[in-house]
Amino acid sequence: MLKMEQSAPPRYEEDWADVYEFIERDSSRKNVPAIEAIERRLAFSPLITPNPGAKQFAPIHVPGREPPRMLLPPTPHFQAPFSPHPPPVQQVPSYSPPHAPPSYETYPEVYYPPHIICNPYDVPTTSDRNPPYYTEVTTVSAVTLHSMTPPTHKIETPPSSPENSFGPLASQLPAIKMEIPMHPLPHNGELDSTRSSPSSTTSSERSPLQRKSRIESNKRNPTDKKFVVHACTYPGCFKKYSKSSHLKAHERTHSGEKPFVCKWQNCSWKFARSDELTRHMRKHTGDKPFRCSLCDRNFARSDHLSLHMKRHSTI
């Protein structure tokens, strides 16, 4: 027992010596990283008995962060814009063929006219043996344009006689009778005036359109002497007629006069116009003079036939 107590103090002194050595080492090394200092403090604390056989923690290595790299997108490749004009053609150096050996015959120089030009849009075709070949395009000269212009038509007047129109063959052919249709004029005075005046043209030489336009002008022009206007004299009525019979029939509507009386037995109908009496008489006789051309139906009045024909057209 006494031996154990005497050997104990040297062991505690060794432990405290290690602690002092650790403190001195820590104070002398101020540049040690903070992580290693903390590990050493935890490993060799004065309150913990050091274990020389224990494994020490390896220092933690923190790799440095590389600066970020900016990756730019690839540059876009734009296609050249389309242009209606063709790109300029590079000039090809002229090719001169090798000189032929001298011959005994001399040929005259060939002159090319200035209107033969080279087309710049044709691509030359070359080979090892043949020189570059260019297609030639001839421009249209003034002579060609003059020949392409349409010929001017000469205005020819009709011949004075039919024999001249047929030429020399007219004497060999039989006589041809030229028939011109004669259209009656609406007024006899117009025909008399054309016959009396030598300067005016005859009615046969006028076209139907000219005669129709003249008739319409006579109807529309009330100041003409040939155009007679029959106006109604009843107060407040402004109707006008070209025929006196139409005016008389109109005046009977104002006066109430009905001179046309039906003579059928036991019939006392009276009318202001004669055509109305004729149409009324067909009711007694049963006459139907208006017949349909498409079917076998007959009608007593023309307006009834016109209405019936419209029904055929709609079917």
Swiss-Prot record:
One GO molecular function term of this record is:
RNA polymerase II cis-regulatory region sequence-specific DNA binding
Q: What induces it?
A: Expression is repressed in response to high levels of dietary calcium.
Q: What is its main location?
A: nucleus
User: Which Cys residues form disulphide pairs?
Assistant: none
Compositional bias ranges of the Basic and acidic residues kind: 213-222
InterPro entries, per database record: Znf_C2H2_sf, Znf_C2H2_type
Give the ZnF (C2H2-type) ranges.
230-254, 260-284, 290-312
Report which superkingdom the organism of origin falls in.
Eukaryota
Biological process GO terms, please?
fatty acid homeostasis; innate immune response; regulation of gene expression; regulation of lipid metabolic process; regulation of transcription by RNA polymerase II
Where are the stretches annotated Disordered? 149-169, 182-222
Q: Where in the cell is it found?
A: Nucleus
Q: Which UniProt keywords apply?
A: DNA-binding, Metal-binding, Nucleus, Repeat, Transcription, Transcription regulation, Zinc, Zinc-finger
Low complexity: compositionally biased ranges? 194-207
Answer yes or no on keyword NADP. Answer: no
List the PANTHER family hit by this protein, alphabetically.
DENDRITIC ARBOR REDUCTION PROTEIN 1, KRUEPPEL-LIKE TRANSCRIPTION FACTOR
Its family remark reads:
Belongs to the krueppel C2H2-type zinc-finger protein family.
Function of this protein?
Probable transcription factor which regulates lipid catabolism, storage, and secretion, probably by modulating genes involved in fatty acid desaturation and beta-oxidation, and lipoprotein assembly and secretion. Involved in reproduction, perhaps indirectly.
Protein name according to UniProt = Kruppel-like factor 3
